[in-house]
Amino acid sequence: MLSTSFKINYSIGSVPNGIKTDTFTFFLLFFYSNIIGLKPALAGLAIFIALCVDAVTDPLMGTISDRTKSSLGRRHPYMLISFIPMSLGYVFLFAPRQDWDMSQNDLFVWMTIFTVLTRIGMTLFDIPHRAFGGEVTKNYKERTLLMSWREMVGWVAGLSNAFLGYGIFFASTPEYPQGQLNPDAWFPFAVTGAIFMILSVPVSYTHLRAHETREDLVWRLLLEKK
């Protein structure tokens, strides 16, 4: 039976995706269209391209992770390095400033590159991490409970990111009654989110121990369906 401490440490691995999802949903498009001045159509296209890349890299990462043979385990090497592209992409997404005098094409390329990089970094961690949740125990109810914990922590992380943004970084000031229009608040907001991403990866990673092969997992799930 999985201990509560293990469930908590494993679930912390959902923090990066919770932060990323909240930011991409509520903040990213606003930043580029209202602060930096990228045309909304181009910003939307950049997000669409990143989603298309994600649709390819997610199943590809699953296949690669399943077939990996390493002294660290099948899942662990990718989770270990994931924080690098994840955090760099996330921070650089919010690095442009109004005085950089970038063209629409330059901004579009910048947004596309670092949105894709952030998603690739997230894929490197999230796909192996989710797969591990299906391997750590043979008990169906335990796996279900573990993944429930994971989703709950990810939801809390996303909600906390929103409160942190609106409550602190984008709080109203005399100069900017609508705090989100303050251009100086965005980069510190991104750096703070990236720090939480970076910290959550090793916390979750160090408590993971893979136990079963991919074949074991597939056959077990098929039997449970019957």
Regions found by a protein language model. Give the residues of each.
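Membrane-embedded alpha-helical bundles of multi-pass transporters/translocases
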Residues: M1-R209, R214
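Positively charged, low-complexity/disordered segments
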Residues: A210-K226
